Amino acid sequence: MNELIKHKLELLPDSPGCYLHKDKEGTIIYVGKAKNLKKRVRSYFRGSHDTKTELLVSEIVDFEYIVTESDTEALLLEINLIQKNMPKYNIKLKDDKSYPFLKITNESFPRLVITRYIKKNDGLYFGPYPDSYTANEVKKLLDRIFPFKKCKNPINKVCFYYHLGQCCAHTICHTDKVYWDRLIDDVKHFLNGKDDKIIEDLRSKMLAASEEMAFERAAEYRDLISGIATMRTKQRVMSKDLQDRDIFGYYVDKGWMCVQVFFVRQGKLIQRDVNLFPYYNDAEEDFLTYMGQFYQDKQHFIPKEVFIPEAIDEELVAAIVPTKIIKPKRGEKKQLVALATKNARVSLQQKFDLLEKDIKKTSGAIENLGQLLKIDKPVRIEAFDNSNIQGTSPVAAMVVFVDGKPSKKDYRKFKIKTVVGPDDYASMREVLFRRYSRVKKEGLQAPNLIIVDGGVGQVNVAKDVIEKQLGLTIPVAGLQKNDKHQTHDLLFGNPLEVVPLPRRSEEFFLLHRIQDEVHRFAVTFHRQVRRKNSFSSTLDHISGLGPKRKQLLLRHFKTITAIASATSEEIQALGIPKTVVEAIQQQITDNKNDRSSP
């Protein structure tokens, strides 16, 4: 488990929602849903798992999540995200097929049926549901509460369901429109979560049955109430009108804005886009700028409708987005914008929490390091490393960490000027003297700690330069690597000793990052110098090829091999005369022949 995941786990909300696991490429490899995001996502990284789960966890390097209003919303969203992203760990479990809906037919005597096909103006549809089992469970519950007609064709006698109280036989039951309108309204309220009146009615019937000692009937009412509690289908994440729309929400805090966009296609929320950025003007103006860039830069599909928050001027949006702009005032559409806004707030708060934790973690590491070394808090650390290959193109590099963060504007590169051959001690002596004699002479900011890459010899050289040659009182430490070239020991003190540093401590991780960074910076610089030197030596003494033309060739082709592979026309295109190009090609050929000769 990496540091990013560790910190994100601490920030998960106790809310329902969906989580998306990602691999090192940023690809979504698994989508899941949870009643409690904190408990569910944390469970992946704690305790033991079966083989397939261990395999999944081994590939997770990051995750994100979407907060929903209910577990049902989370479940339906999970299905849509899986269908959209086809994560490799979900594909075997889910197939891409149409989803079941509940439908109240528009017949004279309406029926409640399950269908996978939607026809406009052919009845009322509720859903979609994740699978036929869920749809059937909801229908069974509705059948026990609302007596819809069960038979498709009229018959002249009551059916079996009538005797169970689950069918209103059209020959003897209510035939007036008011009855059916009221029944349909009750079902709509139930499926939209507004079931308090229904529950109260069932509770009254349960109490009445108990008073009449009809305990079996009372138990049936009790089970219905329990069934309603577990099968509510409050679907604000989904839209039943099959419309394509983008739903925008945003949140601002501490000079930052987070914009969250829900992409609804054919009535289903299939994906979301999250963008966090600093804003410098009025929040509403910057939001409008973002919308314009969103549809222009991303070549985004223009939906039939775009929902925007109430604070945004819809006329201005209409000027930059060529589609119908809606600012919902009430109902489900307004709740969808509110949900997008809520997720924007959650995402922005997570960013702040991660930053705060990172600051506290780094600050604590610096403070602890100072206490271990018995020095002042090393707010500014300067670290050095040499790089050469058998003494050729020797260079050194310095990186600077301020408050535990790289300060790249303060990085410095050094070409070794006075040392001949592979002598790391002499190279370190030269570089440190050049650096800190200038610090002393020009009154530059001195570090609180100097770190050299190396063992006892390197540290002693550094201390000799700093303390004896320059008379400075800057603490010097060394970072020793093991035989696997990994950070292993911190050397410090007089005499030098290995500082006891827990391998899993934040201070050790900080030192490891510093050593890796200075090594990377030194090696990168050495490659640049070596390539340039190789370039220069090969192209030296060619008439008509001065420093400017050499630099031009270096910037364009990067290597001698690339020049050798280029045509005369490609080289001449840089403005180099044909006679000079021929001389270059001849020189490269001669050098190649010399190297291949015995």
From Swiss-Prot:
It is found in: Cytoplasm. Keywords: Cytoplasm, DNA damage, DNA excision, DNA repair, Excision nuclease, SOS response. The keyword DNA damage applies. GO terms for cellular component: cytoplasm; excinuclease repair complex. SUPFAM superfamilies: C-terminal UvrC-binding domain of UvrB, GIY-YIG endonuclease, RuvA domain 2-like. SMART domains: GIYc. InterPro entries: GIY-YIG_endonuc (IPR000305), GIY-YIG_endonuc_sf (IPR035901), GIY-YIG_UvrC_Cho (IPR047296), RuvA_2-like (IPR010994), UVR_dom (IPR001943), UVR_dom_sf (IPR036876), UvrABC_protein_C (IPR050066), UvrC (IPR004791). Residues 14-91 form the GIY-YIG domain. PROSITE patterns: GIY_YIG, UVR, UVRC. Residues 196-231 form the UVR domain. One of its GO terms (biological process) is nucleotide-excision repair. Its main location: cytoplasm. GO terms for molecular function: DNA binding; excinuclease ABC activity. Interacts with UvrB in an incision complex. Belongs to the UvrC family. The UvrABC repair system catalyzes the recognition and processing of DNA lesions. UvrC both incises the 5' and 3' sides of the lesion. The N-terminal half is responsible for the 3' incision and the C-terminal half is responsible for the 5' incision. This is UvrABC system protein C.
